[in-house]
Amino acid sequence: MAINTDTSGKQKALTMVLNQIERSFGKGAIMRLGDATRMRVETISSGALTLDLALGGGLPKGRVIEIYGPESSGKTTVALHALAEVQRNGGIAAFVDAEHALDPTYAAALGVDIDNLLISQPDTGESALEIVDQLVRSAAVDIVVIDSVAALVPRAEIEGDMGDAHVGLQARLMSQALRKITGNIGKSGCTVIFINQLRQKIGVTYGSPETTTGGNALKFYASVRLDIRRIQTLKKGTDEYGNRVKVKVAKNKVAPPFRIAEFDIIFGKGISTLGCVVDLAEETGIIIRKGAWYSYNGDNISQGRDNAIKYLEEKPEFAEEIKKLVREKLDKGAVVSANSVAKASEEDEEEEVDLEPEE
């Protein structure tokens, strides 16, 4: 069979078929990758500079994100910080409160504009996911948070009796909904964050017995999966004032996965952004720690990490200078714990494999 070497003829045929596809399916249905308007993935700050580094810049826009972990580990806090960041940049944010547990006072303390926040408290999982799909398709909303997947109860389960068995109903619901939602997300550029809970698998003798609710569909469709854990309780004397948390990027389709970030969450205030700055300034050598003392340019600024954070709070101009120096070092390729890839465990590697979602 002769190979067609007529380049101009091929180009003419290609132009004709591209025009025909665009007439049939709309402009933008097919394009050269170099012509795409969104070659670089835009990001939303998570509120923690260390987590932004671990994510390769922040939470990606126009993607499905899953945040999961044990109770009171900071899942909703990270999601609320993302909402606040979008609102600060003039975007519209929505919160689907399936758990009926949103605290407006805490959200406001984290910087969320609660007066302009769209909130829905649906009764069934079908209603919640249909609302999410309509918000995404509108292309008017920039970010939607669903709290949580475990609370998306199928209508049949709500209307049935207490002891009825409903095997796989929620997994099928999530699979059907995500097939619709992901296609619309790509067109609208809306970020959808699912908060999820952990459950224990019964009879597991090898590997981690932990699993997330809602089946495998969300694992498959999510571009980013964040595993957040509380690793330390922060105390002043006997009074607890916050938690130290560790976030593992269990899956990332837009940057290297398996990075780990640590930061503080202060009760009533949210993520300690200046705590992240102090940690990164120390790792990059901008602030030097000798024993308990922290120094900058040879001058002692505080004794102890908490006092170093307090010093930056009291001197915002100095804090901005340190932030700028940290970012410059990181832009030049400085390697810190948050942007170095941690060794993946066997459980991580199993999690990264994309399984076909169950029907």
From Swiss-Prot:
Binding annotation for ATP: 69-76
Disulfide bonds: none
Subcellular location field: Cytoplasm
Location of the region described as Disordered in the Swiss-Prot/TrEMBL record: 337-359
PROSITE patterns according to UniProt: RECA_1 (PS00321), RECA_2 (PS50162), RECA_3 (PS50163)
Domain of life where this protein originates: Bacteria
Acidic residues composition bias: residue spans: 346-359
Functional summary from the UniProt entry: Can catalyze the hydrolysis of ATP in the presence of single-stranded DNA, the ATP-dependent uptake of single-stranded DNA by duplex DNA, and the ATP-dependent hybridization of homologous single-stranded DNAs. It interacts with LexA causing its activation and leading to its autocatalytic cleavage.
Similarity comment text for this entry: Belongs to the RecA family.
Name of this chain's protein: Protein RecA
Higher taxonomy: Bacteria, Bacillati, Cyanobacteriota, Cyanophyceae, Nostocales
